[in-house]
Structures are given as structure tokens and as C-alpha cells.
């Protein structure tokens, strides 16, 4: 049976994001993936922070200065017979809620681990978010051109700390200065590494067969024998790759290589297009939507202002769940129940915009937006339903924001509300005073907000410390009890950017006491958009 042209397009799509701890090599691997996808001609390494050729996926001013990827951008490229959508996630010391939310828009994740360090803190946090939806995970052990930890130890650590089985697909031969290449367990082939070829796609020499004398000649008898001994162990002690278990998020195929040396990335990409799922079904508040349905549906997972400094616009990123987008089509924005004609949607190669004529499930569209679209908005061809699972996360850090020029209060509030709709930061307005409190998941979000208020809204602001430890969204089914709670706790209540009521706690103890005192009131750590 041949698939219809529409279903062929759906089956070709692979949508994934990269998760890693800062400096594990995520931006470098993004570059190399784009190089293999022929989206860029030569990989400009990120280390050249002084040069003008910044990594293709890092773009706002501040990112350019710091050499870090603050904004989630989207890149589409062809690979083999597939079309791959890569969603870049902020990966530096200070990520934000955007990173979490981007993981709600993908069908698969690539976990990049620095093989000299193993599993690190940020990787653990991001894996927890992928667990909310049992997202399939591929793993790339990076930096084999440096001295690394014992590969078996690395696999054990991933299994024990992240609670996911490891199925090695390739296995390293040596590391650091002695790194010779990798052996593919399922193809019985050895790929030999040449250093100094990181900027281009290299012709790799392949030796067929583990017992081929050419292998001993190529890597040396000692390393060849060590490889054979290690593989005996590996085959006995590790999981075999099983596609069903991978799709259920229970095992992860593991690849070894060096992104900087541009080696091993293609093996991982081959695995990604072969095994990662085509666009998956999605839950709404009324039913499950299948990618094969012909009516268009999609949801907004991120909003970004000022993607083009020359235009003061904001772009909403929408993941297509079902149906085909065609230029000029009319869509229903479910939250407002209004119909809108979408004629100028964008697709992205980071920083380069191009208008798109059509898009399919798994693709990401950019919608021009002048403040009318919010995170979590669902678009359909008329059906009134809302996609679920795109939450706000309770901030962990808080600052009071103060104007240098008190006459600009109106612009400040406008800027903060827009930035909060976009997910750059959360803003809380205490009921009992005129303060403005800004909440974030990571410190860098505060810097981003001040620099964007200045460049986009001409508002100069500074931060002051504030006695807030955490926030929880509150609601209560019993209106009378809720009124009593609000009356007695007025000094600790605030409205967020969307006018939802939140309890602002001065300490975790204070929060616990409030929860005990008011058992009928629900204190939520996340809030559905």
C-alpha cells in the first residue's frame, strides 16, 4: 500500500531537541548536524567569540557577546530521506523556562554528555522534563579527542542516575591523543578518526570485520586487542538495542565521538532518522489528535520578541500537530474564539527567515504577533479544543525591579507583561503595594530582561533584592474559604502577567505553614497556559 502524498510528508518528519549540561558541546554538535544536513557550508566554531562568524544557532545581541545560546531557535534540514527539525535549547549556565517548554514540542531528544565528566546537574533536570512525556532519548558521548572516563563507567552512571538503560551502538577505540575511531556493534565496521578535519565532512576510512588484520595495522595491535576484549564485556553486560523500548523511553542508544572533530555525529544522525518517531499524537482537553488527521491543528510553545532588530515584531513559535498548513489559510485561535488568516508564516534557519508556503506535522511555524498570541495557544480549523502539557514553572529566583525614571512606569509594565507572555520571565504585582517582582528559573533571565527593556522599550531599570523564596499559583473550589484565605493573606498575594493569583512565600517554611493552615486551597507548582 502506498501512502498518500500527505502521509508521506508526515512520515518523513523528525523533530528533536538537544539536552546537555553547559559546555558539554551542544552548540558544536548543532553546528555539525547542520553541516551534515547541508544547511551550512563550513562550521564556524563557537570558540571564536571575537570573530564575526558566530555559531549559526546563537543569535540575540547578548548571545553574540557571551557566546551562549539564550534563545530557542529552530532549524530545518534534509538528511537521507527525512526532513529534520532541530529545536535549539538554551544550554549555558543559565537556562530558562523556554528550555523546559521546548521539550514539550519535540518527539525525541538527543542527550549530549561530556565523556570526561559524565552525567551533570542540568542533564538530570532536563531528563526529568522529558520523563513527563516519556520522550525517546538518543545519547552522544562527546569529546573523545580528550581524555575521558572509562566508557563502561559512563554507561553505568547514565543507567543509575537517569534510570534509563543504555544500548551502545558504537564503541570507542582509545581516547585523547590515542583516539583512533569507533567500532559499530551492529554493522561490524570500524570507522577510523583523523584529527584536524573538524570543519568539513571527511571521507572516513572503514575497516570491515572485528578480526580483520587491517584493523591491527590501522590502530595498532594493542588497541585492537583491547577493543576486542572490551566488546566481549560490553556484549555481556549491556542492553541490546530494542526499538520498542527506545520509543517507550526505557533505553537509549549510545554513540561515541567528538563533535569538535566532526566524528561520530553522522552515526548518531543515521540512528535518529532510522529510529526516532515520526510526529506523535497529542492530548487535548477533549481528545487525542493524530498526526495523520487532515484538519490543521497546532500549539504555541514559545514567543520571542525582536528576532529581527530591524523590525519590532514578535514571533510565536507553533508546533504543527496535524494537517497541512497552506499560505493564506484561515485558522481559529481557540482562546479568543477568533478566526485569523495566516499568510506570512515563517520557517527558520537560525537568524535567516524565509516565508513558508506549506508545513506539515512536526514542523515549526513562526507567526507574526503583535501581542495577540500567548504561550499555550491552540490553533485549529474551527474545532474548540486546547492542547495540554505546556506549563508555566514556578520561578526559583526573584528580584524587585525599580525604574531609574519614575515617569516610565507605564512602559515598564507594558514591557514586563509582554516579556512574561513570551516566557522570558514571570512578573508578579503584589496586591498590597505597587512593587513589581520579577521571577525566573535562571539568573541570566534577569540580565536579559534589563537589556531588552532598554533596547526594545527604552526603559532603564535596576534590580533590588526582595524577600521572596518561591511562588505558587493558588485556587480553591470553595469560594467562601478562598475569600477568607485572600483576606488573611493579602500581603502575600500577587497577580502574575496573566492576572492569575499567586501566593508569594518568604521561605519554604512559610509556604508549608500556609499549606497546612489552608488545606482546601491548592498551591500549584506549575500552571497550564
Curated annotation (Swiss-Prot):
Annotated InterPro entries: EF-G-like_DII (IPR053905), EFG_III/V (IPR035647), G_TR_CS (IPR031157), P-loop_NTPase (IPR027417), PrfC (IPR004548), RF3_C (IPR032090), RF3_dom_3_sf (IPR038467), RF3_GTP-bd (IPR041732)
GO cellular component: cytosol
UniProt GO BP: regulation of translational termination
Compartment(s) where it occurs, according to its Swiss-Prot or TrEMBL record: Cytoplasm
A Pfam cross-reference name: GTP_EFTU
Binding site for GTP: 20-27, 88-92, 142-145
Keywords on record: Cytoplasm, GTP-binding, Nucleotide-binding, Protein biosynthesis
Domain tr-type G: 11-280
One example GO MF annotation: GTP binding
Signal peptide: none
Keyword Cytoplasm: yes
Function: Increases the formation of ribosomal termination complexes and stimulates activities of RF-1 and RF-2. It binds guanine nucleotides and has strong preference for UGA stop codons. It may interact directly with the ribosome. The stimulation of RF-1 and RF-2 is significantly reduced by GTP and GDP, but not by GMP.
Family that this chain belongs to: Belongs to the TRAFAC class translation factor GTPase superfamily. Classic translation factor GTPase family. PrfC subfamily.
PANTHER family: PEPTIDE CHAIN RELEASE FACTOR RF3 (PTHR43556:SF2)
Protein name: Peptide chain release factor 3
Organism: Shigella sonnei (strain Ss046)
Classification lineage: Bacteria, Pseudomonadati, Pseudomonadota, Gammaproteobacteria, Enterobacterales
Amino acid at each position: 500500500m502506498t501512502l498518500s502524498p500527505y502521509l508521506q510528508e508526515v512520515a518523513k518528519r523528525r523533530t528533536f531537541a538537544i539536552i546537555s549540561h553547559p559546555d558539554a558541546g551542544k552548540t558544536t554538535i548543532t553546528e555539525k548536524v547542520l553541516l551534515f544536513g547541508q544547511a551550512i557550508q563550513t562550521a564556524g566554531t563557537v570558540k571564536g567569540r571575537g570573530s564575526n562568524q558566530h555559531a549559526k544557532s546563537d543569535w540575540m545581541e547578548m548571545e553574540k557577546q557571551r557566546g551562549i545560546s539564550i534563545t530557542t531557535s529552530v532549524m530545518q534540514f534534509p538528511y537521507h530521506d527525512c526532513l529534520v527539525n532541530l529545536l535549539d535549547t538554551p544550554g549555558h549556565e543559565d537556562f530558562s523556562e523556554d528550555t523546559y517548554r521546548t521539550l514539550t514540542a519535540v518527539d525525541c531528544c538527543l542527550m549530549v554528555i561530556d565523556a570526561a565528566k559524565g552525567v551533570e546537574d542540568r542533564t538530570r533536570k532536563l531528563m526529568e522534563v522529558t520523563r513527563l512525556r516519556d520522550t525517546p532519548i538518543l545519547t552522544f558521548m562527546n569529546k573523545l579527542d580528550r581524555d575521558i572516563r572509562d566508557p563502561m563507567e559512563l554507561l553505568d552512571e547514565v543507567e543509575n542516575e537517569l534510570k534509563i538503560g543504555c544500548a551502545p551502538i558504537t564503541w570507542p577505540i582509545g581516547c585523547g591523543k590515542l583516539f583512533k575511531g569507533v567500532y559499530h556493534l551492529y554493522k561490524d565496521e570500524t570507522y577510523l578518526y583523523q584529527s584536524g578535519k573538524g570543519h568539513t565532512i571527511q571521507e572516513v576510512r572503514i575497516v570491515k570485520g572485528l578480526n580483520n588484520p587491517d584493523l591491527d595495522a590501522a590502530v595498532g595491535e594493542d588497541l585492537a586487542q583491547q577493543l576486542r576484549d572490551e566488546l566481549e564485556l560490553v556484549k555481556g553486560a549491556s542492553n541490546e538495542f530494542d526499538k520498542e523500548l527506545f520509543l517507550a523511553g526505557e533505553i537509549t542508544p549510545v554513540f561515541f565521538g567528538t563533535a569538535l572533530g566532526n566524528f561520530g555525529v553522522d552515526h548518531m544522525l543515521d540512528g535518529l532518522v532510522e529510529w526516532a518517531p515520526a510526529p506523535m499524537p497529542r492530548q487535548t482537553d477533549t481528545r487525542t489528535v493524530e498526526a495523520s488527521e487532515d484538519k490543521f491543528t497546532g500549539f504555541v510553545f514559545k514567543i520571542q520578541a525582536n528576532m529581527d532588530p530591524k523590525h519590532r515584531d514578535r514571533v510565536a513559535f507553533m508546533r504543527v500537530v496535524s494537517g497541512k498548513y497552506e499560505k493564506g489559510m484561515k485558522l481559529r485561535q481557540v482562546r479568543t474564539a477568533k478566526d485569523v488568516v495566516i499568510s506570512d508564516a515563517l520557517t527558520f534557519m537560525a537568524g535567516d527567515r524565509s516565508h513558508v508556503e506549506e508545513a506539515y506535522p512536526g514542523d515549526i511555524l513562526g507567526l507574526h504577533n503583535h501581542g495577540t498570541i500567548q504561550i499555550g495557544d491552540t490553533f485549529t480549523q474551527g474545532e474548540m479544543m486546547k492542547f495540554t502539557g505546556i506549563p508555566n514553572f514556578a520561578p526559583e529566583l526573584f528580584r524587585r525591579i525599580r525604574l531609574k525614571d519614575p515617569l516610565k512606569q507605564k512602559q515598564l509594565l507594558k514591557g514586563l507583561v509582554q516579556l512574561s507572555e513570551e516566557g522570558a520571565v514571570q512578573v508578579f504585582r503584589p496586591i498590597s503595594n505597587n512593587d513589581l517582582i520579577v521571577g525566573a528559573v535562571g539568573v541570566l533571565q534577569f540580565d536579559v530582561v534589563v537589556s531588552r527593556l532598554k533596547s526594545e522599550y527604552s526603559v532603564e531599570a535596576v534590580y533590588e533584592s526582595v524577600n521572596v523564596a518561591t511562588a505558587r499559583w493558588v485556587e480553591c473550589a470553595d469560594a467562601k474559604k478562598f475569600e477568607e484565605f485572600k483576606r488573611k493573606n493579602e500581603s502575600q498575594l500577587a497577580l502574575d502577567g496573566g492576572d492569575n493569583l499567586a501566593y508569594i512565600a518568604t521561605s519554604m517554611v512559610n509556604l508549608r505553614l500556609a499549606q497546612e493552615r489552608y488545606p482546601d486551597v491548592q498551591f500549584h507548582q506549575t500552571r497550564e497556559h
